[in-house]
Swiss-Prot record:
Membrane topology: Multi-pass membrane protein
Positions glycosylated per UniProt: N66, N274, N310, N324
Gene (name only): Snmp2
InterPro entries: CD36_fam (IPR002159)
Residues in compartment: Extracellular: 28-522
Name assigned to this protein: Sensory neuron membrane protein 2
Superkingdom classification of source: Eukaryota
Family listed: Belongs to the CD36 family.
Listed PANTHER family: SCAVENGER RECEPTOR CLASS B TYPE-1 SR-B1, SENSORY NEURON MEMBRANE PROTEIN 2
Residue ranges, Cytoplasmic side: 1-6, 544-556
Localization in the cell: Cell membrane
Entry keyword set: Cell membrane, Disulfide bond, Glycoprotein, Membrane, Olfaction, Receptor, Sensory transduction, Transmembrane, Transmembrane helix
Length: 556
């Protein structure tokens, strides 16, 4: 007859095997399937509601480079800047869904973004703080003018011809030009080498005052509110040539310049982002392939950008124009150590690769940290297999012989239709060719590197943000008086951090729905495994012990 301890020991082994099976096979498969179901975007689901309205707003922090020696810069001095901020805004995102694809694997939407100033988080800074900053709109106009002078003049021609006979000074100029070059259809239909160009530039210099509010330097004194959102006004009641210039600026289509109700124009960095969106996104819902959830499939009905140089004369799409990854509001699930992932930013017209760095803990939630690699805005050129970013749209600036910018700087001219240069904050990692020309920069990898902490199982972002800086070259432009003595420098304007820190409510929700469940399953796993092994071993020892106590009968 089998001893009861052997039966109990066998049961203990069964319990241990069951615990191992549950902990290493059944529970992971159950969790994996549950996560797959929860991340897929289906009409009416909880994930769909979170997709349409983010559960909490993003943090949008702006740091401004206040210029402390603007008068001396006009005379050729090296710029001195001081960082002020952060000015913190809550960024609310709401998606207006257009439609699902027939098979439910794609969803199209337009995203509306709204910014609310967070006075508490920004204190002691306020939106009414006064700053002296780079006059972005005037500087951009002059540099575009320098690069495309003939096209700009021809663009002005139709408007100006109707005004020439109404403006006495210009009538005289027209007669003089006709004597010099013969009769023309338009006084502006001239080449860059035309001797009459100097006379026209005199009028341009004179009309800069009317266009840009009588500027005394390439810097503007304004409020943070105006510089970032409400707009720095210019083109206030212009006349003659000034009005033609303003009309040309207005019709250039720049997102950062808007027309006011009184007809004037206003420049702001982010005013155009505050309100209804225009770009139509198509993203993967995760149906059929949860690893592709939120992956951008199309932007404005195109799989690729048409911003950067393409790989061949036949128009083969270059790596620079490829749209990869999500919009950084969430990431695909089931992350692994050592992997990488992409985010796409429409603000800089490119995809950015993030690489695994280390394991982290965020308020008791385990995750992985990802950060940009050295290839983000490193050296650009054929020898680095990224020459498609070398648009070479800037004249007479600090750049290499091949026309590409030095390491750490990316020309966004073709992205923003303005000569804006992207760097990391405080020009972190940028070439000394740029950093040596500015005083007051304090690059710090911990403060200025882009990173994101992600819960590895679900792909939920825990904290982190995109950190980038917007700059513009400051330089002397031939025959433009206000720029005559300027040094050639890459001038910082602002840097921004757009990201998230999961708040207490979301942390509690996340722990309740996932972390506590995982802990419970883990406890069940190890309790059954260890308990079963313990019972089996204990009963086996007891059985052996009892066998040893059996007294053999004496031999007769």
């Amino acid at each position: 007859m089998i001893h009861w301890s052997l039966i109990v020991s066998a049961l203990g082994v069964c319990v241990a095997v069951l615990g191992g099976y549950c902990g290493w096979i059944l529970f992971p498969n159950m969790v994996h399937k549950k996560v797959e179901q929860s991340v897929v975007i289906q009409d009416g689901s909880e994930q769909f509601k979170r997709f349409v309205n983010l559960p909490q707003p993003l943090n949008f922090k702006v740091y401004i480079f206040n210029v402390t020696n603007s008068d001396r810069i006009q005379q050729g001095a090296i710029p001195i800047v001081e960082e002020i901020g952060p000015y913190v805004y809550k960024q609310f995102r709401q998606k207006k869904v257009k439609h699902f694809s027939r098979d439910g694997s794609k969803i199209s939407y337009v995203q509306n973004v709204h910014f609310d100033f967070d006075a508490v988080a920004s204190a002691p800074y306020t939106q009414d703080d006064r700053i002296v900053a780079l006059n972005m709109h005037m500087n951009a106009f002059l540099q575009v003018f320098e690069r495309e002078i003939t096209d700009i003049f021809q663009g002005f021609a139709n408007r100006l011809n109707s005004r020439l006979n109404q403006t006495p000074g210009v009538r005289v100029l027209k007669r003089l030009m006709e004597r010099i070059r013969g009769k023309r259809k338009s006084v502006l239909q001239i080449s860059e080498n035309d001797p009459g160009l100097a006379l026209l530039l005199v009028h341009l210099n004179a009309n800069l005052k009317a266009v840009f509010n009588d500027p005394r330097s390439m810097f503007v004194s304004t409020s943070v509110r105006e510089y970032l959102f409400d707009g720095v006004r210019f083109c206030i009641n212009p006349q003659g040539i000034a009005k033609a210039i303003c009309n040309q600026i207005k019709e250039s289509g720049s997102k950062t310049i808007r027309e006011k109700s009184d007809g004037s124009l206003a420049f702001s960095f982010f005013g155009h982002k505050n309100g209804s969106g225009h770009e139509v996104y198509e993203v993967h819902t995760g149906k059929g392939d949860p690893m592709r959830v939120l992956e951008i499939q199309k932007l404005d009905d195109s799989h690729n950008l048409q911003v950067w140089l393409n790989a061949s004369s036949e128009g083969e799409t270059s790596v620079c124009n490829q749209i990869n990854g999500t919009d950084a509001s969430a990431y695909p699930p089931f992350r692994q150590r050592g992997d990488s992932m992409y985010i796409f930013s429409a603000d800089i017209c490119r995809s950015v690769q993030l690489f695994y760095q280390t394991d982290i803990q965020y308020q008791g939630i385990p995750g992985y940290r990802y950060s940009i690699g050295e290839n983000f805005i490193n050296d650009i050129g054929p020898e680095h297999d990224n020459e498609c970013f070398c648009v070479d749209k800037l004249a007479n600036v600090i750049k290499r012989k091949n026309g590409c910018l030095y390491a750490g700087a990316l020309d966004l001219t073709t992205c923003l239709d303005a000569p804006v240069i992207l760097t990391l904050p405080h020009m972190l990692g940028a070439s000394n060719e740029y950093r040596k020309m500015i005083r007051g920069l304090k690059p710090d990898a911990k403060k200025h590197q882009t990173f994101v902490d992600v819960q590895s199982l679900t792909g939920t972002p825990l904290q982190g943000g995109k950190r980038v800086q917007f700059n513009m070259f400051l330089k002397s432009i031939n025959r433009i008086g206000i720029t005559e003595n300027l040094p050639t420098v890459l001038m910082p304007a602002i840097w921004v951090e757009e990201g998230i820190q999961l708040n207490g409510e979301m942390v509690a929700f996340f722990k309740k729905k996932l972390i506590n469940t995982l802990k419970t399953l883990n406890i069940v796993h190890w309790a059954t495994l260890c308990g079963g092994i313990g019972v089996a071993v204990a009963c086996l020892i007891y059985y052996i012990y009892q066998r040893g106590r059996v007294v053999e009968p004496p031999v007769k």
